[in-house]
Amino acid sequence: MTHELSPQLLESFSRDFNADPKNQVISRAARRSGLLEAAYNPAVSQRLNRTFSIELDTDNVTNQQQSGRCWLFSTLNVVRHNFGKANKAKNFTFSQSYNFFWDKIERANYFYDRIIATADRPLTDRTVRGYFDWCQTDGGQWHMAASLIAKYGVVPRYAMPESFNSNHSQALDMVLADKERKDALTLRRLAQADDQEKLEAARTDFLSQIYRIMATALGEPPKTFDLEFRDDDKNYHLDKGLTPVQFYKKYCATDLDDYVVLANAPDHEMNRVLHLGFEDNIKGGYPNLFINVPMEYLEDAAIAQLKDGEAVWFGNAVGRQMDRKTGFMDLDLYQLDQLLDIDSHLSKADRLATGIGESSHDMALVGVDVDGGQVRQWKVENSWGDKSGEKGYFTMSADWFREYTYEVAVQKKHVPAEILDLLKNQPIELDPWDSLI
């Protein structure tokens, strides 16, 4: 059956709209200020009061600017708060550009291997298409950042500061993606011809060119540096000639082996380990593993870690029911259904299954307000600079956390043993087009 939009049907839609006088009032407000502003609910500010019963002592916020490095910024924020606590230097900041440099090269290395491994498949194969489509994006996961830190260490921000291309990564991503896609066609042809000598030579040459691009765009990473800072008591510290790995092992009180990522993806089987191998970025690094569990496990573990004095990395759908100016995140922030007289409600599972729900952004939990055992609100450290929210910090309702948070990275000691035991089971391999991408 076909359904043509006839003039008569369209005219009936117009009559329905004009039959209710309030539609014209709503339309004038929406056209003047936009749908979101017209639907804004000021009562939210009365509930979210920016006071927290548990709150970490943090300082300056970071700014990823026009780049998709939230996963890296939020992971480094967790690590730097641990560093600040251990070394009494709460305003110390790591270089995000340093790890970003190595991430791009490691992604290219993994991409070339995936292309070679699937050379016998057509370019129209859905997995191959996924490799090409997602070549050299900025996005990532906790385990990707952990892999970079474990292999390359970290450096202070002053040792490799931000550049235009790290802050505004679109052009760099385009150059890398275009080059790697062209390289992929060459590697496929050589792999199909089973010419291993030429294949390895081409692969190595391509990686050398990727390094050159990154060194041109960001500068070469330091091999050693001098650690120099004043702590919160104004005491001077100097440690010369550290490598990035030495610095991390000596000064950073974060053992990455101690962490696990809990996920709440109700469109997937519960109490199973999921592997997002498509986003693994380092050969021999941490695989992107999630334990998919009910939401209360994520909430309980996050609270326990905050009580223990440590920030919590979390992946979420920040674009939903969030006001960048105030930093409020609440399910009733924009009452669009009431404004437009519609019902758009979907369950968390249905949002994921239909593509509406996605873990599009990563931030750090640095506080929580618990009253009588019930969570009221969370304090969130974003990486959008100090001009958004309350000097860069956002306030998130308990319901928003439950509906729009999909992952938290927490220490294993905060997770029940029966949940950790699930890691002993074979993980479910997720496709490149899975809803958790």
UniProtKB/Swiss-Prot annotation:
Q: Report the locations given in the UniProt record.
A: Cytoplasm
**Keywords recorded for this protein, A-Z:** Aminopeptidase, Cytoplasm, Hydrolase, Protease, Thiol protease
Name where it mostly resides. Answer: cytoplasm
Q: Record's CDD domains? A: Peptidase_C1B (cd00585)
Source organism's superkingdom? Bacteria
- Asked if Chaperone is a keyword of the record, the answer is no
Q: Name one GO molecular function term.
A: cysteine-type aminopeptidase activity
Name the top EC class: hydrolase
Which Pfam family is an annotated match for this chain, by its short name? Answer: Peptidase_C1_2
Biological process terms from the Gene Ontology for this record are: homocysteine catabolic process; proteolysis; response to toxic substance
Q: Look up the EC number in the record and give it.
A: 3.4.22.-
Q: Which GO terms describe its cellular component?
A: cytoplasm
The record's active-site residues are 70, 361, 382
> Which InterPro entries does the protein's record reference?
Papain-like_cys_pep_sf, Pept_cys_AS, Peptidase_C1B
For the keyword Protease, the answer is: yes
- What does the sequence similarity comment in the record state about its family? Belongs to the peptidase C1 family.
Q: Which PANTHER family match?
A: BLEOMYCIN HYDROLASE
UniProt name for this protein = Aminopeptidase W
